[in-house]
Amino acid sequence: VPVRLDVYNFGLEVKTNEGIRFIDGAMVKSFECRDLTERESKLYINTKEYSSMQPHLSGFFEILSEGKQQLLKLTVVRIKEPDYNVALNAGSRDTKIYKVTNYYLANESGLYKLPVSRNKTVKMLKNQGFPETLLTNYTGHETDLKPVFDSFNSSQ
């Protein structure tokens, strides 16, 4: 069944024989999407499952790595209103929409937002018990972060 995640309205659009139906995100606990081009499945879980750790989050976490230390990805939409000043004829007249991605570490002790800075992320992961040998090849990109978590979780 074709499904599209609506990040802005926090829900799922499902294509059925009768047309496209919208399911409110609050009614969905988790879902799995299979990407036909990559032959890979992605698991999404509602942020309310982690509400005891971070009550202010809303949306769906994409689970990038499962295990003792989970790597989660949360994509949200930010809207920047126009800041045009007529008197100065300066600023932007357009509303801008940004897609912001944040990464989180989840374990039995809590849910932690990973810092954007590589050095701060490495320091935080060391404090969570990651060995320094796993963190040597981490450059600060998601493509390097996922193998670090996968290696750590497979060794536990």
Task: Give the role of each language-model region.
Residues P2-K120:
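Aromatic-patch recognition
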Residues V122-Q156:
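Long, compositionally biased interface segments
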